[in-house]
Each structure stands twice: as structure tokens, then as C-alpha cells.
Amino acid sequence: VTPTKLLIGQIAVVFAIVLLGVWAATQWCAHMLGHQAPLGAPWFIASGWPIYKPWKLFEWWFHFDAYAPEVFDKAGALAGASGFMGCAAAIGGSVWRARQRGLVTTYGSSRWAAVREIEKAELFRPAGVFLGTLKDRYLRHDGPEHVMAFAPTRSGKGVGLVVPTLLSWIGSAVVHDIKGENWQLTSGWRSKFSYCLLFNPTDPRSARYNPLLEVRRGLNEVRDVQNIADILVDPEGALERRNHWEKTSHSLLVGAILHVLYAEEEKTLARVATFLSDPQRSFAATLQRMMTTNHLGAADKPQVHPVVASAAREVLNKSENERSGVLSTAMSFLGLYRDPTVAAATSGCDWRIADLMDAERPISLYLVVPPSDISRTKPLVRLILNQIGRRLTERLEGDPKKSRKHQLLMMLDEFPALGRLDFFETALAFMAGYGIRAYLIAQSLNQTSKAYGENNAILDNCHVRIAFSSNDERTAKRISDALGTATELRSMRNYAGHRLAPWLSHVMVSRQETARPLLTPGEVMQLPPTDELVLVSGLPPIRAKKLRYYQDQNFTERVLPSPVLRDGAYGDCPAPRQDDWTGQVRSVDRRLAADDESAGATIEAEGGVQQQRHPGLPEEQTAVTQEPDQEDLFNPADDDSETVADKRVMDRISTAARAYGINEGRGDDIVPGF
């Protein structure tokens, strides 16, 4: 609409208001006078009512004022009021036209969201996670989408976002709580309707969780174990590519974990560590044990697990030095579980992943790690989150709100500190469809980029983004770009006149459209401590106020003492679920050792004594043969003649042939290792 058309429309509205007001006064006056004949004939009849021309009031007023002065005074006041209404409409229209001239969008149309737009987006609903406040009203998001917050340390993200949300969310929650503050403030209220579980691998009173018991026996066992090994070999979440040692140790860990699950009485990661580094036997003997254990067969027909046997054979086929490197690499990933406190915390399951969404009551799981141990225990917390994310997004059985008993909120404060979780990054895109919401909090964009790389999809998959005043220029620039660009009208005045004149006789005013960010990066970094920015997809940005739970009685009433933890069995936990491995113990079967083409072959040292266990001999007896020493076989300093040297060579070849005769029919190489 052009400015000229707006002006014409404004004038038409003013005249219409005045005309309707005078017409209404005329009709009211005629009604009060009883539509008498001296008033003249009506203009027309509408539904039995005589309608007079609008200006008849003034004729009647001139001729009959003396007969009914009060009636004409009131009619005149009514007509005059219409004039005032017309003036008010003219003023309002002028103001509106002035604002419309200012709403230019040549370079951009960014602006702050209006209250009616926020209401339409349902951000004032009394449900969902907390985002902040606006005009003394809570800003909350109750959709299935994820939320991401950028807030520097000590900026109020805990007291304004995490604590209020946990003190109002009635579904299940997984809370990454580094310092334990959220446990102290929110577990008391949440324990009234949910199972409150504190998992702190450095605290003997912690609830227990054994990642190996989440492995499902059967077709899924290899996949589940490989997922566990993926996290074990990448404890920091910083590997983009694995080197040779990490790849081979991954294969060894998969085989060792499967063997422990099938054969060992204690089915824990601590047992995997002690199994691979048992001081009572050599590493080669451990590999032989893996290849000769009856994992799958019955008593009359033993059968080794093919994945276990393949992993053991892969390592056994390597040279002694390479085997040692593979073992040391694998043990470096299992060192955490040698800690007795960590081993105790992972020795059993007080809760299962399925309980998070299908238990009788919601689950409130607090993953608490002291800052002093955060680097050491990071692999275990990463493993738990990885298992939760993978297991709960495997199957979609209809609407999750109907098929699941509880919705799950993953409140991950300082989530980049956990390192890169590849599955978590990709799962954000479809996690909401399974009834899982993520509330992610990071200090800055740099922290996220350091963990997930520059081109990560974390921010892209978050529907709602919250930004506090930033200390990082890159984050401030990203927020400024996200807010968009507005178009402003700048007035330029030029004054002209005589130098000695008392006033300047000519003033020229010109208006120019210019582009300006809604907030510059500097303004983002200079936001007041009480302000925050809320960006919702499909809605103009919101400049809101931070929430402080300790200033709101609705929250302070819910801050209750946390549950008391005692030594021994954890008290507040759901009913136990049956796993697939408890009670499953298998032993070595000698028939498998007899069938294996290299059973019992152990090389103690290169160039040393080779001990070969013959299937026909008792287990305690070994056949010992002296392997030819390469230096003695080909000694350039030997003074013997060529004939004598040839005879010595033939003697040693005969010795090797006799040693080979022991293994005749088993397919062993004459010279092992080649």
C-alpha cells in the first residue's frame, strides 16, 4: 500500500466517523420527538423505522429548538462527540502511518517478538521446560523439540534454567550434574514421585550400574558389545580416525567382553580387565582359554563363540611385540575399572535403561562426578549416555506418549565436557520422535566446536536456543547473525543561511535507509546480567529476563532436603529386571583344544624355547624343543669348513623336523611365526 492510498483511506475513515455520528444524533432526536409531522417526510423506511437524512438535525435544531431545548442539546452533544472521535481517528491514523513508514524492510525485517506472537507460539503455557520470564510471566517450552543454551560459567544457568525445570518436570530425567548441586536442590522434591538415583562412581554409596548387563544375548549381543567397545577405545571422545593399536584392541575387547559374559562368574568391566591381565597366566594362555571355552555348545557337543575365537586368533597370530602392544593398549582403556570404588559401582544394576521410560514410577538419574575426577570417569559417563541414547531409540511402537509410561528429559549441563558422542549428535534429529527431549547447556560455541567440530549438527537440531551475555567473540558473532538484520531510517539535516543571521533560514531533511544488526556482537557481550535472548524457530527473537528460583516462592517451597544415602544396598530404586547373563558360567573344554590347530602353542620369547602342548599328552605335560638359534646357524665368524657347516645346518633342520613330527596332521607350520 502506497503512502498516498494510506492518506486517502485515513481521510475517508475520519469523514465516515463524523457522518455516522451526526446521522445517529439525527435518528435519536427524531425518536425523542416522536417522529412528528413537522419534522417532515422520512428519507426512506427500513423495517418499519423512518430514516431521515443525516443533516436534518441541524434544520430541526434551527426551527424547533425553543420547543425541546434539552433534546436538541443532547443531540448536538452526540454530533459533536463524533467530531472528536474523528479527530482522534485522524491522530491515530497519522501515528500509525508514521510507524509504517519506519517499518521498512529493504535490508532486513528483524524485530523483537510481540506478546501476542509469544502467546500464539504457546510459550506462556503452564507446562514444559523453563526458558526465562517476560513481563512477570514464565516462558516455557512444552513441545517435543530440543533446547540449547549458551551461558558462561556463573551466569545463572543453573538457578535460572536447570533447577526450575527439574523442580517442575514430572517425567523421567537424566541429569549430568558435575558438582552435585542439582542433586542437593531438586532430589528432595523429585523423590516424592520418582525413583531418585545418584550415580557417582567415586562414592561407595552410589547406585550401581553395570553396562555389560545391558547386552542382549542372541542376535544383538555382538552389536551391543561393539557399541561398548567403541566408547572404551575413545575415552575422550576426540578420535576421528583410529590408529592400528586402537583398531586391534577394539577387536580384542569385543572378544574378551563376550567371553566374560558367557564364561566368567563376575560379568563386569573390572573382570574383563583382570581376565586380560591375570597374573597367574600369560597373555597367550588367556587367548588360548578364549579359544577353548565351550561358550555355545552343550556338554556333549562343545562349541566356541566364533567372534571370541576370531578375536583371540587375530591377536595370537601377531608377533610377540605386537601382541604386547595390543594388550597394553586395551588395558589402558580398562584402567578406570581397576579402581575398587568404580568396580563396586559397576558390579551390578540397581536400575536398567528400560526403567527410564517404562518403570512403575519415573526415574530421576543424577550422573554426579566431582570436578577432580571428571577426566578420569568421563569414559564411564559417556558409556552410560551412549547406551541410553541407543537403546531407547531402537524401536518405535506407535505414539511414544501412549506406548511409553514416562517421557524422558536429558538435562545435560556442560555436555561438551563429555567429549564427542557421535551417536548423540545424529540421534538428536530423531530422538524427539521417541519421547526423549534434550536440554543442552554449554559455555560457548567454541566449547561445542572443540568437541564436535566446526560443522556439527548439534545447534541445527535444537528448536529453541537461549543465549546469555557471552564472553566469547565468536559466540557473540553467531548470536548476532542469528538475530538478523533490521532496516533503519536515518534522518540527515542540512542547514543553510547567512553566517551572521540570527537564525538559519533553510533546513533540508533527508531520510536514508540503512542496515543494522538487531544486536551487534558487542551489544550481545554487553547484555545486562538480568537479560537473556530466546530464539525459537519460526518466531522473532525474544528479549527476556532471567529466572532466579531463589527469588520465586513457587520454587523455594519445593527445595527440600535430598535423600539420605547409606552404605549397602541402594534404597530408592525400581524393581529389578532379569538379565540374560546372570548365572551363566562356562569352562574350558579339552576337546576344543584338541580340535584347534594351534592349541597350546605359546612362544615365550623370540629365539627362545618353544613350548608346544600336544593334545595326546596330559595338560600338565609339555613337549619342549629347542628352536634353532639364528646367530648360531649362520655365524660369519665360524671357522668350520663349508662341509662341516653344511652338516651342522642339516643337523638342526633334522631337529626342527622331529619337532614338527609331534604335530603331524595338525597343520602347524614347521617354523611358527612365518
Residue ranges and their predicted role:
Residues 1-155, 159-161, 208, 351, ...:
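Basic- and hydrophobic-enriched, low-structure N-terminal and domain-boundary segments
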Residues 42, 498-502, 648:
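Coil-to-alpha-helix initiation sites in intrinsically disordered, low-complexity, charged segments
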